[in-house]
Regions:
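Short, structured beta-strand/loop micro-motifs enriched in basic residues and often containing a Trp
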Residues: 26-28, 128-139
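Short acidic, low-complexity segments enriched in Ser/Thr/Gly/Pro
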Residues: 108-134
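Short, surface-exposed secondary-structure edge patches
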Residues: 33-34, 142-145
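Acidic, serine/threonine-rich low-complexity disordered tracts
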Residues: 26-108, 155-271
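Bacterial N-terminal signal peptides
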Residues: 13-25
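Bacterial N-terminal signal peptides that target proteins for export
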Residues: 1-16
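Short coil-to-beta transition motif at edge beta-strands of beta-rich domains
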Residues: 148-156
Length: 271
């Protein structure tokens, strides 16, 4: 590699440092890539979500909705792993300036424990967001043990989700490769997960009950030094039974139906 005028010296030194870090990390034949940030650390992302929803209720014709949303996400680390949990505040902003805030908790093993909404408008304003869009590092979080390229692991997390309560997040992950991207030593992880959905939403006209499951395949590139996500992409497919329940006191019968949801998303670090 030439160190001539074709590339600024600081960039070359940064690249060499990343290669050295990757070499040290893999010196024993493996690497640890658990999410372990310092309190106060902030990460900025652009999140693009494209969703297609097909809904059929009662004897009505099926309705199709197609939507693409671009969000700006700010992740701020509130509590370090040394205190027991890693707690991260996730703020998602629409182009119009609307903000929804989540708090994400990870346990001592850096596995997802809970995602909670603490403020902001209802979920409908932000489209069909899932774990991969809110906090991509948790979509197939590796174990804290030393991993080698090609290693696999099981995902089996009991967690709390917004508007739902307890759920079991299951699947499998795989460390695809180790590389250097934009001067950072990174690990690429692929995962396939399934999340059950059992949600009841109160409306003025009654209640909406949603039951089913959502399967997601994702690829995540994480910084080896602290586990932060550099970029991610995911494909989700969900099939749900839908029930529209009348308000208390009404003699109207419930309306049952079915909803099929497909979501494609990308997450890119910009700061």
């Amino acid at each position: 590699m030439s160190l001539g005028g074709t590339r600024p010296l600081p960039r070359v030194l940064s690249l060499l440092a990343a290669v050295a870090a990757l070499t040290v990390a893999c010196g024993g034949g493996g690497v640890r890539i658990a999410f372990r940030p310092q309190p106060g650390t902030r990460y900025e992302y652009v999140v693009t979500v494209h969703s297609t929803v097909k809904t059929q209720l009662g004897d009505q014709p099926a309705q199709n909705d197609d939507e693409e949303t671009v969000l700006r996400a700010t992740h701020t680390v509130l509590r370090s792993q040394r205190a027991g949990l890693v707690r991260v505040r996730v703020q998602l902003r629409t182009p119009g300036g609307t903000t929804r805030t989540f708090v994400v908790d990870l346990d001592r093993a850096a596995q997802l424990d809970a995602i909670e909404t603490i403020e902001g408008l209802p979920a409908q304003v932000f489209g069909n967001l899932g774990v991969s869009e809110i906090f991509p590092a948790a979509a197939g979080a590796p174990p804290t043990r030393v991993l080698h390229a090609g290693d696999t692991w099981r995902i089996d997390d009991h967690l709390r989700l917004p508007d739902q309560g307890p759920a079991r997040f299951v699947g499998a992950g795989r460390l695809v490769e180790l590389a250097v991207v934009r001067g950072r030593a990174v690990a690429r992880v692929r995962s396939a997960t399934r999340l059950p959905v059992a949600r009841r939403t109160e409306l003025r006209q009654g209640q909406v009950v949603l039951r089913g499951s959502q399967a997601t395949e994702s690829t995540t590139t994480q910084d080896v030094s602290d586990g932060a996500v550099e970029d991610a992409s995911s494909l989700s497919h969900g099939v749900f039974d839908v029930s529209l329940l009348p308000p208390p006191g009404s003699k109207a019968p419930p309306v049952d139906g079915r909803m099929v949801l497909d979501v494609r998303s990308t997450v890119r670090r910009v700061g």
